[in-house]
Each structure stands twice: as structure tokens, then as C-alpha cells.
Amino acid sequence: MSLSRRLTLCAAAAAATALSLPAWAQTKTKVAAIYTVPVEQQWVSRIDKALKAAVARGEIEYVFSENVANADYERVMRGYAEKGHTLIVGESFAVEAAARKVAKDYPKVSFVMGSSGKPQEPNFAVFDNYIQEPAYLSGMIAGGMTKSNKIGMVGGYPIPEVNRLMHAFMEGAKETNPKVKFSISFIGSWFDPPKAKEAAFAMIDKGADVMYAERFGVSDAAKEKGKLAIGNVINTQDKYPDTVVASALWNMEPTVDRALKAVKDGKFKAEDYGPYSMMKYKGSELSPLGTFEKKVPADLAKKVKDKEKAILDGKFTVKVNDAEPKSTL
């Protein structure tokens, strides 16, 4: 795959502000990120957004590489470490051994990697999008909005990070609609909108009237067929105002900001940042209903709001199930 590298710079206003600061305040952490997909892909776009927010605050210098093939990942990691970047962020799901090897070879560099594994001392921290809570809430909406009692779900790969979101969504849907059934498919890619769209079309043709858009392309199919969709990670309702009812949103800022502070304070350590994606840390949330504010029945909206409060109050815990979900249709 092609490799492109971009340098993200502060806006002119931010730069002007930085010039007025004392020298000690202008010391910036050098951060590099490595993405195996285009930066606009929903999952990595949330990491990029959080890092760019730190750029805008004048805290970091940030560069990234996108579309990095798995075979090139180790080389790119080493390149950034050699160039003096003190924090490297990425996704090591398919390159765990190689990524951890690089971390061992550069003990003075801090690594924060999306991973299915555990932290590795002393400098390899891990994270994940623990957004099963808003996924459950979005499932409640889907269960209450389907008229055919059939929901289609299209995912990338059946790995724990995807499976737990699908299971949470399904449990939420069953809470508001015990009769609901699910059609589930994985496309074997993190970024193949045409393939996801075709998988969604197949489910819609079999009666699904609400689609769970774990991947890009699903909402396009729902829009073309006049069906509804539930988004994942980002809110795309602005692009699909009559299609996307709600989305389970991932906010990477709590994770990124915690890691940056640890690096700046010289206290970075190998830890699991996954929990900072949960609602109580503002790492995730259910999107506003927006264009569907008056289309979602009031009693359904109240049930969702009450459940959201129960989660935040610690009175309800969304079960984490990492097993591969199966179709019930």
C-alpha cells in the first residue's frame, strides 16, 4: 500500500499565541502516529482529532503516516523513534510482536498502541475504544425503531474490540424489543466501503430495516434503500440526516491527554488506557438525536436517557462479551 506522511502544523493564530509565551512554555512533545488505513477512516480519525487538538493548544508537534502496510509497520515505527519522537501512537492489532519488539529497543520512547494485548513494561501502553456503553444505548434505539424486527450488522473483523460493541448493541436492542433478530457479517477489512455497502444491501434485501454501521459504506446502503442506520465511533448524521438515527461516539481526548501529561511529567508507564474510553471519563457518549429528535418516540427516548443515567451513576454495567457474535436470522 502507498505510504504518505503529513506534517500537522498549528494554525497561524495558535502560532502567534505561542510566540508570546516564555521559552519554557514553548517546549513541545514530539508525537508521531502510524495508521494502517486512511486518516479519514472513522477509528483512526478520532485519534487524529485528539492529537490535532493538542497541536492547536501548542502542546505538541505531530506527524503521521497513513496507509502503512503491516509489513512496513516496524520500519516506520523505528524511523520515528530514531528521529527523536518521544511519543508514538498507533494500532498494533495485526503487528503485535513487531511493535512490542520496537518498544523494547527504544526504552526511552513512550508508545501508546491500540492493542488486544496487555501493557508491556516499561514503555508500551495499550488502549482500545471501550465504547460498549453508548453501543448498548444505540442498540436500544435500534430495537425501538425497527418495524420488521430485523437488524443488519456489518463489521470489519470478528476481533474482541469489534465483538464487544456488537454484543452490547444487540443486548440493548433486545431490551427494547425482545422479538428482534440479527443478521451479522464481517467484510475482512478495516476500510472497504464498497464491500460493506454490498453486505448491507444483502441484509436489507432480506428484510433488515435498521443497519448497524460498524464500517463505512453501510449508511450509504441504508440511505439508498430508505432504511435507518446506527453509527459507530463518529457521528455522520450531517451526511445522512434522514438515515443515521444516532451513533455511539468515541472521544480519544481523555486517553491522549493523559498520555501526553505522563510524558511531559516524566511519569509515563506501561498501562491500559482502555477504561478512559468509557462514559464516566467522557471517552464515549451517545450522540444527540439531532434530525431524529421528533422521530424517535418519546417513551423510547426516555428509556434510553434513563439507562444512560443508570450507567453514569454506576447502577447499570454493560456486559463485555468478546466472543464472535452470530446471526439469529
Predicted regions, residues:
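N-terminal export leaders
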Residues: 5-10
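Sec/Tat signal peptide C-region and signal peptidase I cleavage site
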Residues: 21-25
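Extracytoplasmic "Venus flytrap"
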Residues: 30-50, 54-57, 63-73, 93, ...
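Periplasmic-binding protein-like
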Residues: 33, 85-92, 112-114, 206-216, ...
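An alpha-beta-alpha
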Residues: 51, 137-180, 184, 271-296
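Flexible loop/hinge segments that line or gate small-molecule binding clefts
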Residues: 104-129, 233-243
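Short beta-strand elements at the ligand-binding edges of bilobed clamshell
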Residues: 119-141, 153-158, 241-254
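Hinge/cleft segment of the Venus flytrap/periplasmic-binding protein
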Residues: 265-329
